[in-house]
């Protein structure tokens, strides 16, 4: 006991001497520090010089250029959003308003369809556009990352390379197995992306073009990433009736390719299967016991977001948007389409969002590109069908035909109890599956999922403070160091001298999400300060306009391309 006390005193003395000797730019005083490791919180101060933490402890005699009084506030590592879709909205507003105000300091992008590579056989319909108009003016990750840095970003950014992006570059919008030459080209594109800073390979397999990619091709892509220490992040092929088989596929890919696996937003999105989350988690735990590095993440909501087009069978999407819409207009195909939408495809692993939600009332329309249909934003599909006064399938096809084949949609398809069970598992972390938007300006349109604004405060307010599903320390670990470890970022996610100074300071007694499905454009409350690379981006809840974000790359491969 005496030895421990002496070491503690020596540690505090060393911390103070370090701060005094090096000089301090920013000093956070009197906060309750939750350091990101899962260990108990403690009271203390944090000193920052340039972009790093230089000292922690009781630094009462230290002085700094700027001080933050964190009395009665909680100080944690900046939140790392392991699953984020701000790839293109950052080009409209690098301030990342809705994410910064949640306490997010780093965003992991690139699910399925990443920002690169662009070109090859990709058509206009398979390429994303910058919100508000404008085509990408880059072709690979190097140019995309350079574009972000020229503009300036308030959060740090990292990205996977999307398997769908690779697929459409090589094969366009065609199903079927790739040739040997095409597979070689896919491997080459993955290697190039990894050399330019990609974290690994991601997939989005529940709908085209991702659903066209077979397991063997995914293994080949992941093997190419494995040479660079990459990992595999997957939105699985099915989260409904085929969810157990899809988890098994993800595990199999990790085992065969020799890469760590992170299953995106683990859920059981099928009413008839609610309550089976313990068995699903057990299958993952069993693989972990056998040596497969497989983990998962969740978001704290019982609804997801995808596209209304995903309830149309995959075969109807082949050939791109024009071919897709032509099939919707073909009266000879309507009986088959209607049957498969309402009943699924017997013997198929296709994830049918209609059967998952249990009906039209489980779908809420997010945004519509056609001005004539804007009035339906924020309405449930059954309400839209009634307003259009026509059969449900006719209304569905009309919406898709009139809006370019795409209508972002919120689906209410999984249970609160299943989500809570998953949230409590030590190998399941937290991510938003959201996008940086804002309550004003060009990113304030539409009717987005409330997770865009509220994911992390919702966990801390509802599931920690109110319902005691998690301890504060464990919730913070799931938002910080757990996510940093997944993507090989070694100098963030923990508060410790020498680590990068990404810090979130919040009021644990009042933090809460405000965004709802009915009124989503509302910032969360309770986050007081956000510091990114040593610079204050959120000050007393107000965005300072600072854009100190950088591009993050894997650090756990030692920089060696094996």
Predicted region positions:
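Sec/Tat signal peptide C-region and signal peptidase I cleavage site
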Residues: 17-21
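C-terminal cap of metal-dependent C-N hydrolases
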Residues: 31, 421-427, 433, 437, ...
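Acidic, glycine-enriched loop/beta-strand segments at the rims
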Residues: 33-45, 407-414, 418-419, 467-476, ...
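Active-site neighborhoods of metal-dependent hydrolases
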Residues: 145-148, 153-156, 160-180, 186-207, ...
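Divalent metal-coordination and catalytic microenvironments
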Residues: 31, 46, 51, 72, ...
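Metal-associated gating/positioning segment near the N- to mid-region
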Residues: 62-139
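Histidine-rich, glycine-flanked metal-binding segment
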Residues: 23-24, 33-78, 93
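Bacterial N-terminal signal peptides
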Residues: 5-15
